[in-house]
Structures are given as structure tokens and as C-alpha cells.
């Protein structure tokens, strides 16, 4: 590894004797240094508190030619003799040796060895790519190290990623310690695979699974289609803006849950623990975060295990006001359920795309019949893991754990929360149409009038008070849910927050999203009159100021009713005939009127309410098997009423199934997809990604949606 720098007071930079580069204190963020040298005056300036707050545990030396008392946080006093320079260098070397986490440290050392390989992968450290101009460009674009770090498991020095040996095992043990799990498993093909690993390890045909209707499709795939378990669905909330909410409070009542069992498996209704597994979204895509203690206290005694799908969170234990929501911080006993937590590290933590991790917390039930041992879980793990893993992905998970260790993780997320609060305040100050999704008033005082430090430390400033008009969610109990402060959620005009009804004019969020992308800003997702921006410790005040400025600029376009060709040139140029002479407000009005005509907000809400659930007539696994056998036909969604779905259907994002294999098409689900079909034809350029239904252009030039149903 290249030697790191030494940071020093500006007056000392030229006086230090070191082979390392010496940089001034003001020219570093301390991520590139291995030691710090300060003066006595510096020690009184606040630099020691700053260094402590980083959580980097850097060795700090105080340079003084006179005898001084050693301040707290200083390693030693030096005055410039040769022996002391050696001590400084020794401390810097020691810091470097302890800096890297287990697997990544081993990987970097192995790459530096420069071994000659006759094993796969065939590009042989990139040499194959460099034999062609396109390959050379590819190699130069990504850089040498990514090719050198892509290696075969034929060399055992890095350990085994499938049976968890060597430095790979050490890395996962280290992550388990950081995240407060009993065991942690690194998954290299996303939380879609992580969820399937857990559900395949726990569920079999005939098992009951308590199933959040908000669950990501991967949970349907693993629990219902692959394992064949029988679901008991929990209804969930949607609000008029299109935000995904949480499960209704009444669903956590024991008698209610036992009654649900009587409808699908009456022989299990009175068992002490009728559910093998409950699958709950710890945080929804749109930032509704659950109270894990509350979930376990109300339904835990009915379940062998609870899987908290934490794809959209995972950082909650590093943010004090969110810590209560973390299942991994709970004290559990032998009567509690075992806990699994899956996290999409790549979403808002520090990981390459596809990096995920499974946390297992069940030592408190070890020895009981319901306990899932490591070997059983690892059997499912190997069903879904490649035998040719990409080591940089694994290394990223290792480094992510190191970043989150101790004070550094807490500091990084504290800064993220504060930056997000400042961004919300800026939007409230500069924008009239787009509103942050937070309580407008708390204790009779405007949200934005509280100091940022107060807002960042008290969850009540993000809580969903039951019945409050601003959020529009129904069925919540006190202290059940709160808004994730690291999800910057905005609402757009079109919904009267007081009544939940449509207003005369609206600005569908997809139009705003298109405008932002036209101008180099990429939101995470949008739906109806809501838009989401993910916040991570990567953010800066400058980056968010650019977003706020662009929101204000779009509002000016709305006010000026600018020509569409100026606001959305890509859409206009792709469909010049359709949008000729259109203005921005004209497009907004037309799309808003489409939403109103189909009452899309209520259709979306109804799809996740129990009274509107599609009828279940087959086990999802059986319906899927019929699909694989070809015992299906492709029909227009318009004509699908009363037919049994062979595929799950959904818009993506968010990846939540609206109809599940084995359920009957009709009702709100069918009308919702017909509304989408109308939009595809009426408003080209704004079509959503649909999965499980297929848009086909018929002979008359009209696009229609089709889906597979059982014969």
C-alpha cells in the first residue's frame, strides 16, 4: 500500500523529518494521513476534539521544544530528535497496519504479489482485454487494480467465500460485530438473493408465513414460489401522494392474526407459534420506518422467526433517534423469535451495486427445535451464490463494515441527517409548490424554525402522528412509524392534503423527475405526486444546493408556463408531433386529469387493502408451475377479469407485486393496470417499467397490456 501522509501544523510542515509527504492540517480531511503533528497552540484550538470526532483514532503528536503537559488525546510530545522521528514513523506504520479490514487487507497484499496465473478468469489480470482496441479502452477506463483483484478461488490465500473460511470468514465476523449480529453473511447478488437465502432456509410447503403486502417481489419469489409456503397477508397503507406506508396497527392483534389463519389453514389457528416466519419491511422504499421492538412484542410470540427486510435502511443503529427501530440492538430472550435482517448495502451504505448482507441474530433460541443452524442456512446460501464470486464486491462489504465501526459511522450518519434537514429548510424557504414530507408544525411551532441540532436528535419531528392531515396515512397507532430522515421525500401539487382529494391542477412527479434528469440530477424514484431522493454520507451542501436551485427553477417554468421544448427537450424531440406547441402546464394538466379520471390514487391505495386484495385460489408455487409447464395463455389485461394470474405483476420501481401468481385478476388491480395502459398511449415518453405484464403494439398502432393467465 502506498504510504499515507502526515498532517502537521502549517508552521511545522517544513520542519518534519519523514520520507512521507507532509500536508498542512487545513489541507486534509484526515482520510489520507497516518499521523498528526500539532503545536501547543493547536492543542487549544479545538483540533483534538475534531480529530476525536472523526473516529479515525489517528496517532497525534505534540511538537514542542519545551516541556509541556501531555493533553488528552495526544500520543506523545516530540521535540525533533532522531529517535522521536522514528517513533512518529512507527506510529504511522502501526496505524496503516491496523487500518484495513480483514478481507480487503489480504486482497491488497495478494494483488501486490503479482502472481502469474493459469487459472480463471480468462482475462488474466486484464491482459486479454489489452489485446484489442475495445478491450484496451475497457481496461484503461476501469484501471489496472480492478482486473488484478478479479481472481479465481483456485488460490486459497483469500479464504473461501462459500463455506466461509480464512479472511472471508474474518470479514464476516467483523461485520457481525459492527452491526451487532450473531452471524453475518455477505451476499454478492443483491438483497433479492439475500431474501431468497433466508426464506429458502426457513420455509417449506405448508408452512405459514406472515407476509407484509408491501414486501419486495424477492420475498414472494423465495417464500411463496420457491418454498411454496402459505401466505397470510397484512394490509398496508398508501397515501394520496403515492407514498408507500406501513402495516395497519390492527394487523398486529393476536386474535386478528389467528382469525386470518382460520381462513387459510384452520388446523394451525390455535398452535402456540403458528407462523414459521414473518416477513416485514423494516423501512419501506418511501421511508416509513417501523419500531422493531413493537413488532416483536406484538407478533413475535406467534412466529419462529421474523425477517426484517431492511433493503432500504440498514444504517438505523448508527443514528441515535432511529436506534430504537433496529432489530439488531434489541435484547432478546428464549421466548422471542429468531431474527434475520437483510440489508442492501449498495443502496445507502458504502457498497458496489449488488452488495448485500444477511444478519442472523438467534443465539437466544439456540437448542430449540425452531432454531436454524448455520449449516442449514449456508445450504440455502450456496443455492444462490456463484462459485465464481467477484472479489471486489466482497471487499466492498468488508470496507463498509470498517467505515461504520465505532464513532466514524455515527459521525458520518449524523452529518448526513443534518445536511438533509438543512436541505428541507432550504426547500421550504425557496419553493412554493414542492413540500418536504415532514410535519409542518410541531408543538405549535413551524418545523423549520427549530434548530437543526434539535431536529436531528428527536424523532418526534419525523413521526407520523395518527390521523394527522399532512401525511394522509390511515390505520396508524401512536409511535408506530416515523419518516426516515435519510429519505428526502417531496410532494408535488395535485392533492389537497387536508382532504386527500384531487385539486384542479397538479404537477405529476414524473414530469419533475424528467426535468431533473434533463439537467443532470437523478432522483431515486417518483410516483403520482411524490418524489424520493436518497441521502447518504456522500452528500454535500453544494450538491443539495444544486438540487434546491433546480427545484426552484422548475417552479419558475410552471409559473411562466414555459414551452415544453425548452423544459423537456429530450421528450419533445422524441415525440415532436404528439407534443407540438405544448406548454409545461398543459402537459401537467393532461397527466393530472388522467390520474383524476381513473382515480389512480385510490386504486393504488385499494390494491394494498384487505377488502380489495385479489382472491387467492391457488398456492403461488402451483400457479408458477403451471406457467413453467405452459398451461397458460396470454390475454389482454382488459379481458383478464376472473382469470388466474400465472405471473406476478408490478410497476418497477418499487418492485412490490400488485397481483401474485394464483390470485384472480379483477377489481382495483385490473383497473390500475388499465390506467397505466391509457397513460402509455396518451402520454408517450412517460411510460413506467412494468414487469409481469407486457406492452404490445397491436395492428391498429395502439399499445395494449397483456398478461399470462392459467388456461
From Swiss-Prot:
<dbReference type="Pfam" id="PF03709">
    <property type="entry name" value="OKR_DC_1_N"/>
</dbReference>
<dbReference type="InterPro" id="IPR015422">
    <property type="entry name" value="PyrdxlP-dep_Trfase_small"/>
</dbReference>
<dbReference type="GO" id="GO:0008295">
    <property type="term" value="P:spermidine biosynthetic process"/>
</dbReference>
<keyword id="KW-0745">Spermidine biosynthesis</keyword>
<keyword id="KW-0663">Pyridoxal phosphate</keyword>
<dbReference type="Pfam" id="PF01276">
    <property type="entry name" value="OKR_DC_1"/>
</dbReference>
<protein>
    <recommendedName>
        <fullName>Constitutive ornithine decarboxylase</fullName>
        <ecNumber>4.1.1.17</ecNumber>
    </recommendedName>
</protein>
<dbReference type="InterPro" id="IPR011006">
    <property type="entry name" value="CheY-like_superfamily"/>
</dbReference>
<dbReference type="InterPro" id="IPR011193">
    <property type="entry name" value="Orn/lys/arg_de-COase"/>
</dbReference>
<dbReference type="InterPro" id="IPR015421">
    <property type="entry name" value="PyrdxlP-dep_Trfase_major"/>
</dbReference>
<dbReference type="InterPro" id="IPR008286">
    <property type="entry name" value="Prn/Lys/Arg_de-COase_C"/>
</dbReference>
<comment type="similarity">
    <text>Belongs to the Orn/Lys/Arg decarboxylase class-I family.</text>
</comment>
<dbReference type="GO" id="GO:0004586">
    <property type="term" value="F:ornithine decarboxylase activity"/>
</dbReference>
<keyword id="KW-0210">Decarboxylase</keyword>
<dbReference type="Pfam" id="PF03711">
    <property type="entry name" value="OKR_DC_1_C"/>
</dbReference>
<dbReference type="GO" id="GO:0033387">
    <property type="term" value="P:putrescine biosynthetic process from arginine, via ornithine"/>
</dbReference>
<dbReference type="InterPro" id="IPR036633">
    <property type="entry name" value="Prn/Lys/Arg_de-COase_C_sf"/>
</dbReference>
<dbReference type="InterPro" id="IPR000310">
    <property type="entry name" value="Orn/Lys/Arg_deCO2ase_major_dom"/>
</dbReference>
<dbReference type="GO" id="GO:0005829">
    <property type="term" value="C:cytosol"/>
</dbReference>
<keyword id="KW-0456">Lyase</keyword>
<dbReference type="InterPro" id="IPR005308">
    <property type="entry name" value="OKR_de-COase_N"/>
</dbReference>
<comment type="pathway">
    <text>Amine and polyamine biosynthesis; putrescine biosynthesis via L-ornithine pathway; putrescine from L-ornithine: step 1/1.</text>
</comment>
<dbReference type="InterPro" id="IPR027464">
    <property type="entry name" value="Ornithine_deCO2ase_N"/>
</dbReference>
<dbReference type="GO" id="GO:0097216">
    <property type="term" value="F:guanosine tetraphosphate binding"/>
</dbReference>
<dbReference type="GO" id="GO:0030170">
    <property type="term" value="F:pyridoxal phosphate binding"/>
</dbReference>
<feature type="modified residue" description="N6-(pyridoxal phosphate)lysine">
    <location>
        <position position="347"/>
    </location>
</feature>
<dbReference type="InterPro" id="IPR015424">
    <property type="entry name" value="PyrdxlP-dep_Trfase"/>
</dbReference>
Amino acid at each position: 500500500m502506498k504510504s499515507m501522509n502526515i498532517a502537521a501544523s502549517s508552521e511545522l510542515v517544513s520542519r518534519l523529518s519523514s520520507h512521507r509527504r507532509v500536508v498542512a492540517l487545513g489541507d486534509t480531511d484526515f482520510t489520507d494521513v497516518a499521523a498528526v503533528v500539532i503545536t501547543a497552540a493547536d492543542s487549544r484550538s479545538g483540533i483534538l476534539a475534531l480529530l476525536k470526532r472523526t473516529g479515525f483514532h489517528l496517532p497525534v503528536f505534540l511538537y514542542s521544544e519545551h516541556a509541556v503537559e501531555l493533553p488528552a488525546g495526544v500520543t506523545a510530545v516530540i521535540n525533533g530528535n532522531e529517535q522521536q522521528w522514528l517513533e512518529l514513523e512507527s506510529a504511522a506504520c502501526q496505524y496503516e497496519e491496523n487500518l484495513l479490514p480483514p478481507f480487503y487487507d489480504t486482497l491488497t497484499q495478494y494483488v501486490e504479489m503479482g502472481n502469474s496465473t493459469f487459472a480463471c478468469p480468462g482475462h488474466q489480470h486484464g491482459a486479454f482485454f489489452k489485446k484489442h482496441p475495445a478491450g484496451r479502452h475497457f481496461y484503461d477506463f476501469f484501471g489496472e487494480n480492478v482486473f488484478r483483484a478479479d481472481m479465481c478461488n483456485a488460490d486459497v490465500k483469500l479464504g473461501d467465500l462459500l463455506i466461509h473460511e480464512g479472511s472471508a470468514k474474518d470479514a464476516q465476523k467483523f461485520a457481525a460485530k459492527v452491526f451487532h449480529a450473531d452471524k453475518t453473511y455477505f451476499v454478492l447478488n443483491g438483497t433479492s438473493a439475500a431474501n431468497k437465502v433466508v426464506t429458502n432456509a426457513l420455509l417449506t410447503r405448508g408452512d405459514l408465513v406472515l407476509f407484509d403486502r408491501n414486501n419486495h417481489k424477492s420475498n414472494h419469489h423465495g417464500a411463496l414460489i420457491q418454498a411454496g409456503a402459505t401466505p397470510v397477508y397484512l394490509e398496508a397503507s398508501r397515501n394520496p401522494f403515492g407514498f408507500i406506508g406501513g402495516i395497519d396497527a390492527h394487523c398486529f392483534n393476536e386474535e386478528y392474526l389467528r382469525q386470518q389463519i382460520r381462513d387459510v389453514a384452520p388446523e394451525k389457528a390455535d398452535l402456540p407459534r403458528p407462523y414459521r416466519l414473518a416477513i416485514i419491511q423494516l423501512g419501506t422504499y418511501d421511508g416509513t420506518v417501523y419500531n422493531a421492538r413493537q413488532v416483536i412484542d406484538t407478533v413475535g410470540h406467534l412466529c419462529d422467526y421474523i425477517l426484517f427486510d431492511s433493503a432500504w435502511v440498514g444504517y438505523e443503529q448508527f443514528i441515535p433517534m432511529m436506534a430504537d427501530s433496529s432489530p439488531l440492538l434489541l435484547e432478546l430472550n428464549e421466548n422471542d423469535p429468531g431474527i434475520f435482517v437483510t440489508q442492501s448495502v449498495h443502496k445507502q451504505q458504502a457498497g458496489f451495486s449488488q452488495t448485500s448482507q444477511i444478519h442472523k441474530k438467534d443465539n437466544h433460541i439456540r437448542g430449540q427445535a425452531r432454531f436454524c443452524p448455520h449449516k442449514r442456512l449456508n445450504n440455502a446460501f450456496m443455492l444462490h451464490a456463484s462459485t465464481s464470486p467477484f472479489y471486489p464486491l466482497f471487499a466492498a462489504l468488508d470496507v463498509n463494515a470498517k467505515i461504520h465501526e465505532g464513532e466514524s459511522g455515527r459521525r458520518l450518519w449524523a452529518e448526513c441527517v443534518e445536511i438533509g434537514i438543512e436541505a428541507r429548510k432550504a426547500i421550504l424557504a425557496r419553493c412554493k409548490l414542492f413540500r418536504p414530507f415532514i410535519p409542518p408544525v410541531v408543538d405549535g411551532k413551524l418545523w423549520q424554525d427549530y434548530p437543526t441540532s434539535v431536529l436531528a436528535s428527536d424523532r418526534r419531528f419525523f413521526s407520523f402522528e395518527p390521523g394527522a392531515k399532512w401525511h394522509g396515512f390511515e390505520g396508524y397507532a401512536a409511535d408506530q412509524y416515523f419518516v426516515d430522515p435519510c429519505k428526502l421525500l417531496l410532494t408535488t401539487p395535485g392533492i389537497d392534503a387536508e382532504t386527500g382529494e384531487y385539486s384542479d391542477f397538479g404537477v405529476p412527479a414524473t414530469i419533475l423527475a424528467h426535468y431533473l434528469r434533463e439537467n443532470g440530477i437523478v432522483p431515486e424514484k417518483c410516483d403520482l405526486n411524490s418524489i424520493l431522493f436518497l441521502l447518504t454520507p456522500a452528500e454535500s451542501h453544494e450538491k443539495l444546493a444544486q438540487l434546491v436551485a433546480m427545484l426552484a427553477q422548475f417552479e419558475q417554468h410552471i409559473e411562466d408556463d414555459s414551452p415544453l421544448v425548452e423544459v423537456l427537450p429530450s421528450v419533445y424531440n422524441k415525440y415532436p408531433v404528439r407534443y407540438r406547441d405544448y406548454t409545461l402546464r398543459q402537459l401537467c394538466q393532461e397527466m393530472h386529469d388522467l390520474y383524476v379520471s381513473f382515480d389512480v390514487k385510490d386504486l393504488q391505495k385499494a390494491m394494498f387493502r384487505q377488502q380489495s386484495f385479489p382472491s387467492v385460489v391457488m398456492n403461488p408455487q402451483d400457479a408458477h408451475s403451471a406457467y413453467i409447464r405452459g398451461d397458460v395463455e396470454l390475454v389482454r389485461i382488459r379481458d383478464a377479469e376472473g382469470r388466474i394470474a400465472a405471473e406476478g405483476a408490478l410497476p418497477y420501481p418499487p418492485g412490490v407485486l400488485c397481483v401474485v401468481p394464483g390470485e384472480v385478476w379483477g377489481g382495483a388491480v385490473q383497473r390500475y393496470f388499465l390506467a397505466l395502459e391509457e397513460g402509455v398511449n396518451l402520454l408517450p415518453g412517460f411510460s413506467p417499467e412494468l414487469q409481469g405484464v407486457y406492452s404490445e403494439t397491436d395492428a391498429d398502432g395502439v399499445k395494449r397490456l397483456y398478461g399470462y393467465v392459467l388456461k
